[in-house]
């Protein structure tokens, strides 16, 4: 029962890491990457649909994304969704495909994006600390209900703290890598 708390916390830590990875994938680094478009929803026949379900997305050049809709009639809807997104990239529609040329990042934009990365990383660490608090509360509740001894509680708290430290370290590494990627010219 006691190790179950640590295991559950570690699973939630892993979900936070995956969420952070998805968040970082959406922050463009001056290079074309299909994951930039993961969060774009297209209004398709009245329902919001993820762009990657409506088109194939390829990277023919370092700073170009090519979007080939499966249904050519959806091209205007896809173009509108990209224009309305917060990407800041203008799509070029040639009737059958959409080209997205990723502009080179200015030094100022790079610094702004690096600040954004730090903020997102900090929010992920807050989520980790909340998960730790929940796990610690659960352990204390079990000790209070006499399900575990005080020694078990201390051991459990130590295990939870170690898992938390590992999770925070991983977030710090992910944040540092993304910042480095952004600040590379």
Swiss-Prot record:
**Which Gene Ontology molecular-function terms are recorded?**
ribosomal large subunit binding
What compartments host this protein?
Cytoplasm
Q: Which domain of life is it from?
A: Bacteria
| A GO BP entry | translational termination
Q: What is its main location?
A: cytoplasm
Q: Which CDD domains match?
A: RRF
For this record, an example GO cellular component is: cytoplasm
Q: What InterPro entries does the record tag this protein with?
A: Ribosome_recyc_fac, Ribosome_recyc_fac_dom, RRF_sf
Q: Which NCBIfam families match?
A: frr
The family note in this entry says: Belongs to the RRF family.
Function summary: Responsible for the release of ribosomes from messenger RNA at the termination of protein biosynthesis. May increase the efficiency of translation by recycling ribosomes from one round of translation to another.
Q: What is this protein called?
A: Ribosome-recycling factor
Q: What is the lineage of its organism?
A: Bacteria, Bacillati, Bacillota, Bacilli, Lactobacillales
């Amino acid at each position: 029962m006691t190790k179950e708390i640590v295991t559950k916390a570690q699973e939630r830590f892993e979900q936070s890491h995956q969420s952070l990875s998805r968040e970082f994938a959406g922050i463009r680094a001056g290079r074309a990457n299909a994951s930039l478009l993961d969060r774009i929803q297209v209004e398709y026949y009245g329902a919001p649909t993820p762009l990657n379900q409506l088109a194939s997305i390829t990277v023919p050049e370092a700073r170009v994304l090519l979007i080939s809709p499966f249904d050519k009639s959806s091209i205007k809807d896809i173009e509108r969704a990209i224009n309305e997104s917060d990407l800041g990239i203008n799509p070029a529609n040639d009737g059958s495909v959409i080209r997205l040329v990723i502009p080179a990042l200015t030094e100022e934009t790079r610094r702004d994006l690096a600040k954004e990365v730090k903020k997102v990383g900090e929010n992920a660490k807050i989520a980790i600390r909340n998960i730790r608090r929940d796990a610690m509360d659960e352990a204390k509740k079990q000790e209070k209900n006499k399900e575990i001894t005080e020694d078990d509680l201390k051991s459990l708290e130590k295990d939870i703290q170690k898992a938390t430290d590992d999770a925070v370290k991983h977030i710090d590494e992910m944040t540092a890598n993304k910042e480095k990627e952004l600040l590379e010219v």
